[in-house]
Amino acid sequence: MMAKQVPSVSVSYARNGNSTTSNELGMRAMQERAYEKRGEQYLLIKSPPASGKSRALMFIALDKLHNQGLRQAIVVVPEKSIGASFNDEPLSDFGFWADWSVLPKWNLCNSPGTDGGKVKSVTAFLESGDRVLVCTH
């Protein structure tokens, strides 16, 4: 049985300022390359810290929710502090066709509580009609 390869986007920078320039949708070069792969079921994004991985995921998740038929998106981050990167973001102010929005009750990185309570919250989210949940793994 052959192992299935997971598409990935790796980025290295020449330090010439191009990585901070945005396109007409408000995406930097790495985010644009990741967005080009948005139809993949699995996507691994390897990029330096503060390069825009969180925002790239917002672009991709919004496309999956609005254009690819996904009902809900669960963003899973390795630590609570990274979850703050997924608060509401007015992406349309920069040219994208939608804004990123997470109801406060569904950003479990910002809410106190035990893991048992968070498991109940995930279950409640899955049973709800809401679109996005952010939590730690």
How would you describe each model-predicted region?
Residues 3-46:
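Conserved pre-motif I regulatory segment
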Residues 40-60:
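Walker A/P-loop
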Residues 42, 71-72, 102-107:
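Residues that mark the start of a beta-strand
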Residues 42-44, 72-74, 130-132:
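Residue-level preference for the first positions of well-ordered beta-strands
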Residues 54-58, 64-65, 69-95, 136-137:
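Conserved Walker A/P-loop ATP-binding site and its immediately adjacent core
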Residues 81-116:
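Conserved helix-turn-beta segment of the N-terminal RecA-like "Helicase ATP-binding" lobe
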Residues 120-121:
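Conserved helicase ATPase core of P-loop NTP-dependent helicases/translocases
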Residues 126-137:
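Conserved two-lobed SF2 helicase motor
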